[in-house]
Each structure stands twice: as C-alpha cells, then as structure tokens.
C-alpha cells in the first residue's frame, strides 16, 4: 500500500515546518526518515497518520486521500508508534497490547480467538510475554517502549509508522527491533521509521529520506544517499564513508 504526499505544507505559527513536500515511499520496504532535530521528520510522520492536518497539500494511502477515510478504515490500514506515550494507570501489559485490536473488534467489543492470537504473537515478537500481567507503571522505560510497540504490531496493519522507536532501548533490544522491521518487510508490510543513528538506518533500511529545514534533501538507497557532501550539507559534519564490515552497507565515520 503506497504512502505518498503531494505539496504538503505545515506551519506552527509563522514557522513552516514542512514546505511543499512531495514524495512517494516504496511499498513493502523499510524507509528511514533522517535529518537534524527540528527538520520536520516527526511532523511528516504525524501527517501520515492524520494526527496533524496540513495547511495545504494531501497525504495519500493507496489511491485514497487519508482525510477521506474513516478513523476505523485508517486504523485498519496504518498504525503508529508515537515518540511520546501517555501511560494509562492500572492496566497490564497484555491489556495494553490488546488495545491494538480495537479497529478489528466486532460490535460486541470482545476479543476473538484470532485477536488473542495476534496479541500473543506481538508480545512474543517483542519479547515481553513474561511481562503480560505486570502493570505498565511497574516497567522500565525500555520495557514500556516494547509494550507499546507490541500494541502497534497487534494492530496488524499493512503500513507501520515508528517515531524514534529505539528510544529507551538497550543496544540488544535496538538490534532486535531492527531485525523485527526486517520481519515485517518479509510479510509485505511498509515500514517508515524516524531514526537518529545514521549507521543503523543505513544498515537496516532499504530507503533513506533525508530532511532539512522542512524540505526533502535526498531520497534513495543508502548507497545513493550516504555521501560526504550530503552529510556536510545536512548535518554540518565532515565524514568518511566506508563499507560496514558485516552488511557491506555505507557506514559514516566522523573525522
């Protein structure tokens, strides 16, 4: 399911955060949105999910403008792990993950056997099944992040949006998450993630979208995008590009 924008503009007061952004993201691939703080990455992701409405321009999901879809229709096609979460008081991990099935519930509002199976799969994928009966408020930041990720996975949508998903995660769980994104790709899902680690983005993602000052500066494969000149222009750093020893993907080394 293709996700694309046409002439998207978003302003906060007099500041344009996105300026006439048009792009199309590849279906069934992992795309990373990268760029310096304040460049518009999270704003773009929020426009994709309809959490934020643009001043002008359109977001399309497949052939449909997303503003023409009902909330239920959109939630069956697209899921979002936001950058910040409100942690509900008193609920367990399993209850939180079950919320991901809400778009699929019948009129009776009860979880079916398939719903429960999806919840269990999501908890296993994120390695939190042993935390199922723990309350969210008892968990560490990293454990909570994995619980919210499991809720998104339980939603089982063809498009998955992740806003800084490695926040709070130890390095082993960061690697797990990146590999999990690859598993979602093999299932035919389109994954779009805001990432700060350029080398992680290069190693694990199929496409990079580089943003700066509300504009798309470059889009393409890591080999096409990760160049010393672009890093100098966008991030104001001097870097060398070398093949990463394991994957062979471009890796930047700061001078």
Curated annotation (Swiss-Prot):
UniProt-listed Enzyme Commission number(s): 7.2.2.18
Entry keywords, A to Z: ATP-binding, Cell inner membrane, Cell membrane, Ion transport, Iron, Iron transport, Membrane, Nucleotide-binding, Translocase, Transport
Primary residence: membrane
SMART domains: AAA (SM00382)
Localization terms from the record: Cell inner membrane
Domain ABC transporter, first and last residues per copy: 3-238
MF term (GO), any: ATP binding
GO terms under cellular component: ATP-binding cassette (ABC) transporter complex, substrate-binding subunit-containing; membrane; plasma membrane
Subunit-structure text: The complex is composed of two ATP-binding proteins (FecE), two transmembrane proteins (FecC and FecD) and a solute-binding protein (FecB).
The protein's name in its UniProt record: Fe(3+) dicitrate transport ATP-binding protein FecE
Organism, as annotated: Escherichia coli (strain K12)
Taxonomic placement: Bacteria, Pseudomonadati, Pseudomonadota, Gammaproteobacteria, Enterobacterales
